[in-house]
């Protein structure tokens, strides 16, 4: 997640305030101050500071009772700053989310890792419809709670609701569930899921480029029903590269300092007034020494006689 990603002119964070003095129960302490003496209804505030990103125009709402160290106390966030936590750091944020001590939760965490509930959850909504998610390859993080696919059993819901009749889309787990050790020493687990479409009866499943990494705490490889988990969702724009794609020369097999080369040579001769032709296959074992020199062990096979001779060249 990046902040101020498209502007080079102004990196200052602008503070706006929305006043609501029409409500009789709201009182202002001072016009020059931003605090409120009474706020009986938490949904109604006389003065709500809003932080605006000068690049994208995104607005962050916060109240007077926000914890110290909120974004209104930050002078600016430079262009290119991204939210890209490691596996251990993800478990650290998840520990703070489930902890009863809310002081462990970073005051800005909801801006970077929003919480999805109910029908807006990951396993109910196509990733394209999730907030802030697009096919640009950037990663988005979410808190959510997995639910059971059926009332009985432990199988988790992976099916995504779609508007098209007869069309089925679901997340499919791939690979092994791997343990992750958090900074506090508590163990969690990570599993990778890939989105498949038309994954139903008598339909060929088609793999998409949507990928999800799901993290949960505990000592069990499977998360519990309703347990808070943290998932990061992204669209894989480039396929993974496995090894070098450099072409290997034909008829050459390298085994450390040894290589075999097959050389075919044709020879013509006359026998009884008739021209005949035979083909010899010369097999050479190339021994590459440490000083850069090479020795050649040649095996010459006469195809017409089926004989093979040996010759060593230095």
Swiss-Prot record:
The keyword Phosphoprotein does not apply. Transmembrane segments: none annotated. The gene is NAC010. InterPro entries: NAC-dom (IPR003441), NAC_dom_sf (IPR036093), SOG1-like (IPR044799). Residues 187-242 bind DNA. GO terms for cellular component: nucleus. Residues 18-39 have a biased composition (Polar residues). Transcriptional activator that plays a regulatory role in the development of secondary cell wall fibers. Is a direct target of SND1. Residues 77-236 form the NAC domain. The NAC domain includes a DNA binding domain and a dimerization domain. Residues 160-171 have a biased composition (Basic and acidic residues). It is found in: Nucleus. Expressed in protoxylem and elongating interfascicular fiber cells of elongating internodes, developing metaxylem cells and interfascicular fibers of non-elongating internodes and developing secondary xylem of roots. It comes from Arabidopsis thaliana (Mouse-ear cress). One of its GO terms (biological process) is positive regulation of DNA-templated transcription. This is NAC domain-containing protein 10. The keyword DNA-binding applies. GO terms for molecular function: DNA-binding transcription factor activity; transcription cis-regulatory region binding. It holds the Pfam family NAM. Residues 18-48, 150-182 are annotated as: Disordered.
């Amino acid at each position: 997640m990046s902040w101020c990603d498209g502007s080079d002119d102004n990196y200052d964070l602008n503070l706006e305030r929305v006043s609501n003095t029409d409500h009789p129960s709201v009182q202002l302490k001072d016009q020059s101050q931003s605090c409120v003496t009474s706020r009986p209804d938490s949904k109604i505030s006389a003065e709500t500071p809003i932080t605006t990103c000068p690049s994208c125009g995104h607005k962050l709402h916060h109240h007077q009772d926000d914890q110290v160290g909120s974004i209104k106390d930050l002078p600016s966030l430079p262009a290119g700053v991204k939210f890209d936590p490691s596996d251990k750091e993800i478990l650290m944020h998840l520990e703070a989310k489930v902890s009863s001590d809310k002081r462990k939760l970073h005051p800005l965490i909801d801006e970077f890792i929003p919480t999805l509930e109910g029908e807006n959850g990951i396993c109910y909504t196509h990733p394209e419809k999730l907030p802030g998610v697009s096919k640009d390859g950037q990663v988005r993080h979410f808190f959510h709670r997995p639910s059971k696919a059926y009332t009985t059993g432990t199988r988790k819901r992976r099916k995504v609701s779609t508007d098209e009749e007869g069309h089925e889309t679901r997340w499919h787990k791939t690979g092994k569930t791997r343990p992750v050790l958090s900074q506090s020493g508590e163990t969690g687990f990570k599993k990778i899921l890939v989105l498949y479409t038309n994954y139903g009866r008598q339909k060929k499943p088609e793999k998409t480029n949507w990928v999800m990494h799901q993290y949960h705490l505990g000592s069990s490889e499977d998360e519990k029903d309703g347990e808070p988990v943290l998932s990061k969702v992204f669209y894989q724009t480039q396929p993974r590269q496995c090894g070098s794609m450099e072409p290997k020369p034909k008829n050459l097999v390298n085994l450390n300092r040894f290589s075999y080369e097959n050389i075919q040579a044709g020879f013509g001769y006359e026998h009884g007034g008739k021209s005949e032709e035979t083909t010899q296959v010369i097999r050479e074992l190339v021994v590459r020494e440490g000083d850069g020199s090479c020795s050649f062990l040649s095996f010459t096979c006469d195809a017409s006689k089926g004989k093979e001779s040996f010759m060593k060249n230095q």
